[in-house]
Design a protein with these regions (language model features):
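Hydrophobic, aromatic-enriched alpha-helical segments typical of multi-pass transmembrane helices
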Residues: 1-236
Length: 236
């Protein structure tokens, strides 16, 4: 494959990053009620067709696109001044995203059944003892979120140091990646916080801007500058 084609495919792959931000932004606009404080409202919410379609085509699909975009970003950074950091960050971020996608898939297809049981008057589910599967799910989600945060922060730093991508697109990517995770940690506190705090859509906006900036920078750049010779630092 020629250098122009390789560069073009990298740029197309990078479009997965802003698309992930767009889909996740719309997914966060109508958050589900907190099951710990409003279980009945939560049960009604998760049994709607809207819930399943939103999770499947916004949250889950968005994360799949983020994985493709992360692979493209790591490949593009490989020949830059921050090539090693970019590849390590790519591996960490992708692994974390895959772990989180496992939990997202469970939520998409199992929570509607759980909510339906409550609406049908079958309340014994909430009184059942905790088993290994539930503990493993929470641990998987926690590890996934941590790896996503670490990997994406390192990706942003690699973009800043690369010399081949706009520095501030990396800074936006770091901020956009950190805000949703910090918001989700805040939501877990026992203070009756919103299940999806405002930091989540705010972070998604930053990811859209930062990801689109990176993709545009690659797609508009001459192929020779992006492959081989393209690893040369660009004047900021």
């Amino acid at each position: 494959m020629s250098a122009p084609d390789i560069t073009r495919w990298m740029g197309i792959g990078l479009l997965g990053l802003p698309l992930y931000g767009v889909l996740s932004f719309f997914s966060s606009l109508d958050p589900q009620p907190d099951p710990n404080t409003h279980y009945g409202a939560w049960a009604r919410f998760v049994t709607t067709d809207f819930y399943v379609l939103k999770h499947l085509f916004l949250s889950d699909l968005g994360l799949v696109l983020a994985i493709f975009g992360t692979f493209a970003l790591g490949a593009y950074l490989a020949t830059s001044r921050a090539g090693r950091m970019g590849l390590v960050a790519m591996a960490i971020a992708v692994f974390g995203s895959l772990l989180f996608l496992l939990v997202g898939g469970v939520a998409t297809f199992s929570q509607p059944e759980q909510g339906q049981m409550h609406l049908q008057g079958i309340d014994g589910y909430r009184e059942m003892p905790t088993i290994l599967a539930q503990s493993a799910q929470m641990a998987t989600m926690g590890v996934g979120m941590l790896l996503m945060l670490v990997g994406n922060v390192l990706l942003g730093v690699a973009v800043w140091r690369s010399g081949t991508l706009p520095r501030w697109s990396g800074a936006l990517w770091v901020a956009g990646s950190a805000l949703p995770v910090l918001g989700m940690l805040y939501a877990l506190l026992p203070i009756d916080a919103d299940a999806t705090p405002a930091t989540v859509p705010a972070g998604m906006v930053l990811l859209v801007v930062g990801g689109a900036w990176m993709a545009y920078s690659v797609l508009r750049r001459p192929s020779a500058q992006a492959a081989g010779v393209g690893a040369q630092p660009r004047v900021q």
